[in-house]
Amino acid sequence: MLKIQGVKHFEKSRFFPFFSQNIRSFKYLALIGLGSNIEPEKKRFDMLFRVMMDDKRFKILSTSPMLINEAFGFKEQKDFTNAVMLIQTNLHARALLKVLLYYEVKFKRKRTFKNAPRTLDLDLLYFSQKVKRDKWCEVPHKGAKERVSVILPLGMI
C-alpha cells in the first residue's frame, strides 16, 4: 500500500463526498480548499456545505472525501481535516475570495498567528483558467500544486 508522509486516512460525512448531476450555467468554475483542526470538523464542513447550497451565488458541483493529515508549518497542533469543493459562480475571483473570508468569520475563525489552529480555512485554489496576482488575491493558490492536503482530495472528485 502506498504511504504518503503526513497522510492518515480519508473520512466521509453526509456531504463529503458529493456529486451533482444538475449543472447550471454560471460564468466561472472555482476550486475551494477547506481546512479545519478544531472540533467538530466534519459537522462544520457539512454546515458550510448547507450554507453554500442555500447561497444563490453558488452551485456546488462536487466535494471530495475529507483527508485527515498532519499539520504543517506549526506542527504542535491537532491533525487537520481537509477537502476540496468544486463550485460554479458568477462572482469574479476577488469577490468570491471576499465571500470565503466572510464565511471564515461566520464560522468563528481567529487569526492568532501564521498556521495557527483554525475552525475553518477556505482557500481559493483555482478560478476557471485565470491567473490573478495582486495584494488581495492570488490564483492559482501558491500551495495548490505542492500540498498533499489539496492534491489527494482533488484526485477524488
Swiss-Prot record:
PANTHER family attached to this UniProt entry: 2-AMINO-4-HYDROXY-6-HYDROXYMETHYLDIHYDROPTERIDINE PYROPHOSPHOKINASE
Pathway: Cofactor biosynthesis; tetrahydrofolate biosynthesis; 2-amino-4-hydroxy-6-hydroxymethyl-7,8-dihydropteridine diphosphate from 7,8-dihydroneopterin triphosphate: step 4/4
EC number: 2.7.6.3
InterPro entries assigned: Hppk, Hppk_sf
Protein name: 2-amino-4-hydroxy-6-hydroxymethyldihydropteridine pyrophosphokinase
GO molecular function: 2-amino-4-hydroxy-6-hydroxymethyldihydropteridine diphosphokinase activity; ATP binding; kinase activity
Keyword set includes Transferase: yes
Keyword Transcription: no
Organism from which the protein derives: Campylobacter jejuni subsp. jejuni serotype O:2 (strain ATCC 700819 / NCTC 11168)
Domain of life assignment: Bacteria
Any matching Pfam family: HPPK
BP-aspect Gene Ontology terms: folic acid biosynthetic process; tetrahydrofolate biosynthetic process
Family to which the UniProt record says this protein belongs: Belongs to the HPPK family.
Function: Catalyzes the transfer of pyrophosphate from adenosine triphosphate (ATP) to 6-hydroxymethyl-7,8-dihydropterin, an enzymatic step in folate biosynthesis pathway.
Keywords: ATP-binding, Folate biosynthesis, Kinase, Nucleotide-binding, Transferase
Residues annotated as transmembrane: none
Catalytic activity: 6-hydroxymethyl-7,8-dihydropterin + ATP = (7,8-dihydropterin-6-yl)methyl diphosphate + AMP + H(+)
